[in-house]
UniProtKB/Swiss-Prot annotation:
Induction of synthesis: By touch and during darkness conditions.
Ligand binding (Ca(2+) 3): 152, 154, 156, 163
Gene Ontology terms: cellular component: endomembrane system; endosome membrane
Name listed for the protein in its UniProt record: Calmodulin-like protein 5
Pfam families: EF-hand_7 (PF13499)
InterPro entries: EF-hand-dom_pair, EF_Hand_1_Ca_BS, EF_hand_dom, EF_hand_pair_protein_CML-like
UniProt entry keywords in alphabetical sequence: Calcium, Metal-binding, Repeat
Higher taxonomy: Eukaryota, Viridiplantae, Streptophyta, Embryophyta, Tracheophyta
Region annotation Disordered: where it falls in the sequence: 38-61
Length: 215
């Protein structure tokens, strides 16, 4: 199955959190794999696991974690993800999917048939993907490498201020909109003072809780 996952970041105070491969849905591998074309996502049938096909989750989902991820899609905060909101989120990442395919994606998750995805339906999907992650044998080290590669957009082994800003903007996040704000975040974890974050610094940052800001 095509590997799909979602990174989300920024908690209450510029805190970067990672959900490694927990949301293998909606976002094709092509967004992360620089050798592929961003605008050629796989079909919805290969992108979305079916929540009903999974057994009951063995891991308790953190409600606050679930809510943060859900709110990234629920732009107007009404408790439902519409097709339009899904489309906007994908377009923010440079991913363009035909209207009929978006409808199929919503339909696959939409248990009550109202044409939207509510928090309960999202939790069912999220739980099945978390369960799959815990059973697929992948390691935290692999997750960290995948995450670093998303931020390291040019593949040079460093996360720059510009790259951090680009990723945050593509995820539609409000925090860190300015280069100055992102520069302060980089400085928090830039141990060698070169203005960039290398993989070692990235690992140390993740162990410490994430990018933080005194603002």
């Amino acid at each position: 199955m095509v590997r799909i996952f979602l990174l989300y970041n920024i908690l209450n105070s510029f805190l970067l959190s990672l959900v490694p491969k927990k949301l293998r849905t909606l976002f094709p591998l092509s967004w992360f794999d620089k050798t592929l074309h961003k605008n050629s996502p796989p079909s919805p049938s290969t992108m979305l696991p079916s929540p009903s096909s999974s057994s009951a989750p063995t891991k308790r989902i953190d409600p606050s974690e679930l809510k943060r991820v859900f709110q990234m899609f629920d732009k107007n905060g009404d408790g439902r993800i519409t097709k339009e909101e899904l489309n906007d989120s994908l377009e923010n990442l440079g991913i363009y999917i035909p209207d009929k395919d978006l409808t199929q994606m919503i339909h696959k998750i939409d248990a009550n048939g109202d044409g939207c995805v509510d928090i309960d339906e999202f939790e069912s999907l999220y739980s099945s993907i978390v369960d799959e992650h815990h059973n697929d044998g992948e390691t935290e080290e692999e997750d960290m490498k995948d995450a670093f590669n998303v931020f390291d957009q040019d593949g040079d082994g460093f996360i720059t201020v510009e790259e951090l800003k680009s990723v945050m903007a593509s995820l539609g996040l409000k925090q860190g909109k300015t280069l100055d704000g992102c520069k302060k975040m980089i400085m928090q974890v830039d141990a060698d003072g070169d203005g960039r974050v290398n993989y070692k610094e990235f690992l140390q940052m993740m162990k410490g809780g994430g990018f933080s800001s005194s603002n």
